């Protein structure tokens, strides 16, 4: 779901008193042995949910990478690599055999077994979109001995490895069997993984502070790190995540050395930070985020494809990105449904979005569509920096095209609840909302749940009922040819634009900043990751 990046605008001096007190509380730590090397980080959001199979929230995914490990992982060339296991595929492409590597232990000291991993995959496969699709093709999944997992398919499926090695939410993290058998809609009772860090439950303050210590029993792979693959070598003793919702307080703490790393400073503070010789500013997630508009297909006016097309033609990415980000260094006008910079990227059919030249045609289309003036109810959260601009700019463009628009100011958590409502807009429903996906979550037709055509039968909010889309997604899933997959993906993009399944409004990039006393900070599609980072005094 939403990656809530950025921080609130600068508060007045009278409002900074409480964050300073909160900072003092968060930074208060138990007495540590001399020489304990600690990284203190302010993440993009506070951590409350610590079950990485329960929510797609990116802060929970990031927590997952600290504590847990994966069977497979994706490198910077979009290739799936062995992580906890390597694999073999039968000649008929129906049997995948995974063999666990040596030296794998859970944090409680027990060995990792194939039974643990089977249970973990089964739990993940009930909740994750790619996991559900994979399980539709699975005939059997079993542990054939302590180190061997055998997956048998009903028919060839082209995304077995990509599903198990997916880098972002929901990540198929491995857990002990007793924990993985927790129903997927209930929180797991323990934080026991096999990953490079151990979670310090005793110091966890939900929404305030999370602490991780180096897992001294972890055996890294020999390969160099690349995205979420390769050797996860931990070079510090301890990592602390603390919450500071006030931007200026966090920046002050970074400049004074009270914290070492800030994941997502607001764009207006970047020049100040970049000018500091002790700071390094860099975009770690090179795929960035896709921001998008979503319509409700169940009710007028957007139950009419002609009216949806008029709205699509009225949209323009540049004014949205200018209002959202401001500095073109940190955004990209990009019409690719599967985001620019990925193997499936194409901008075919997106000219009106990327060039902003569709308004005249939008007015003609709307006039010919039978639009009767039904107001477009747009949900506009005002509490999230990366979601404030989109509804305001979109409403202006819709009005220019001839739509009547009702912008309803709210907060993001209300949007999260209200967008699940299938009631009419007059009864608390909605017509349009906006959100952001990290690039890794939308870079292929199976991962990208926004293009689902399942309607009310398991589709994403907005509920387009599009059997043709589902047929094409299944065809993509069955294909193992990159060329064929690329052609199918291009056809899917055409269908997205023809039916206006959703409206891509561009790509933006959220830089991180850290003190130069940190070295070895890695990039990737699911950042930040804290292995490989060292800290000097």
Where in this protein do the model-derived segments appear?
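Structural transition elements
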Residues: 197, 329-368, 382-389
